[in-house]
Amino acid sequence: MSKDQLIRITGVKNLTGISKSYIYQLCQEDRFPMPVKLVPGGTSVAWVASEVQDWIDARIAERDGGAANE
């Protein structure tokens, strides 16, 4: 994935295995990367792919008892 690539909610769901409603809940709780608006003033959003991948990597590192990117 390109560092600057944006992915929509379906892609985020596919990468994480988490439901749409839970993704938004985690965002509200500051526990998941926030989406970016695709158009100023619009309602369509997407996530920065590298931020989602970093979040996934951190979950794996937590499971393995270490920090991400060690």
Task: Give the residues covered by each predicted segment.
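Short aromatic/basic micro-patch
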Residues: 6, 46-47
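A composition-driven signal for long, intrinsically disordered, charge-rich low-complexity tracts
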Residues: 11, 47-48
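Major-groove DNA-recognition helix of helix-turn-helix-type DNA-binding domains
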Residues: 16-46
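A short, Lys/Arg-enriched interface patch at domain edges and termini
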Residues: 51-70
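Intrinsically disordered, low-complexity segments enriched in small/polar residues
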Residues: 9, 40, 63-64
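Polyanion-binding surface elements
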Residues: 1-28, 54-59
